[in-house]
Amino acid sequence: MVIYMSIQEKLIKWYEVNKRDLPFRDIKDPYKIWVSEIMLQQTTVTAVIPYYKRFIERFPDIETLANATIEEVYKYWEGLGYYRRALHLHKSANLMKDTFPKEYKDILALIGVGPYTASAIMSFAYHKPYIAVDGNALRVLSRLYAIEENIALNKTVKTITDIGNQLVIGYDSAKINQGIMDFANAVCLPVHPHCNECPLQKECIAYLTNKQDVLPINIKKVNKKSLSYITGIVVY
C-alpha cells in the first residue's frame, strides 16, 4: 500500500529526524523566543548560543530585564555586536512590563521587530499559522514552487509569504518553520543544493524543471551615484 504524504508531512518528518539541538528550540515562552530571535538578527546560531544562555540566566523574564540598567544589559551583550538590539530589548521590556503581547500586530509594534520575527514568535510560542519568511524560506519556497521573480522585491516576498501562510494552515507551523530553517541549512543550500538528499524531490518544481541552480532570483537594486571626473592633460 502506498501512503501519500503531503509536503508539510514530509518536511515535518525530515525535521523530527534531522533537527538541530538548540537551547531556544521546543520552548513556548514568548519572551525567551523573542530574545533568541533578536540575537539571531545578523548573528550566526553558533555565535548566539553561549550569549543566549548567559543572558537568559541573568534576565529570565520581562520584569527582570525591565528592572535592569541598560549598562548591565550591555555588559551581558558584550561581544555579540550590534548593541542597538540590546537597547531595543531593554526599551521594549520597559514598555511591556510583565506581559508579552499575543497578537501579531502588537508584537510587530515592538522596537526592532519586523515581520519575520513577529511571525516566528506567533508560530513558535503560540502555534499560530504564520510562516516566518527569511532568506532560508525565500530560497526553499522559491525552488519548491519555481517562483521566477526577484526575491529582493517586496511584492515577491509578499507572494511567497502568502504561499507559506497557506502551507502551514492545519499543520504544526512551528515544526514547519523550524524545519525550513534546518532544511535550508543542510539540504537546500544557496549553491549546489543536495537535491539527491531532498525528501521533496517529487514536489519541487525547480528540481523537476532543472532550475534549482538558478533559483531563487535575487537581484538587488544598485544605487546610481553621480561621479565627478577631473580630466587632465599630461605634457611630456
Predicted regions and their residues:
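Short cysteine/histidine-rich zinc-coordinating motifs and their immediately flanking basic loops
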Residues: 207-217
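Conserved N-terminal beta-strand and adjoining loop/helix that marks the start
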Residues: 216-236
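Catalytic cores of DNA base-excision repair glycosylases
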Residues: 3-4, 8-194, 200-209
